[in-house]
């Protein structure tokens, strides 16, 4: 994405110190689950959720940020455990947020497969990818 403008959200107060490192990158002190903060930012072609890693936090962040994905845009939840049956059961909940017609898929990451293969009982990790229609 050589022409991208990147906006980062971070709840840490010192995150804004990263501003000015590049002209097309800005960092805003904001919790991605805070709808009043996010509403001031506009809409985006591509959103990556690499924040809180619990299922509840990822659901909450998706619910807050999804309305700001432009039509044709992508929303990626990074570091999602392959919850298997839980993920399938969660489809009804996800559909309430993103709509029934929204395509999404789970993408296992090679790095995670390598890392978790040596840890029995640890689920494989990946990314959950949504495309706004």
What is the predicted function of each stretch?
Residues 1-133:
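S-adenosylmethionine/decaboxylated-SAM
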């Amino acid at each position: 994405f050589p022409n991208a403008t990147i906006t980062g959200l971070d709840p840490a107060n010192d995150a804004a110190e990263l501003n000015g490192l590049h002209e097309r990158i800005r960092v805003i002190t904001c919790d991605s689950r805070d709808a009043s903060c996010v509403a001031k930012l506009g809409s985006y072609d591509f959103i990556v959720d690499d924040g809180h890693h619990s299922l509840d936090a990822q659901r909450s962040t998706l619910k807050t940020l999804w309305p700001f994905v432009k039509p044709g845009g992508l929303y990626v939840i990074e570091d999602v455990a392959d919850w298997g049956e839980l993920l399938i059961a969660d489809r009804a909940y996800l559909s309430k947020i993103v709509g029934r017609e929204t395509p999404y898929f789970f993408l296992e990451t090679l790095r995670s497969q390598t890392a978790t293969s040596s840890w029995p009982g640890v689920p494989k990790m990946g990314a959950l990818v949504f495309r706004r229609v």
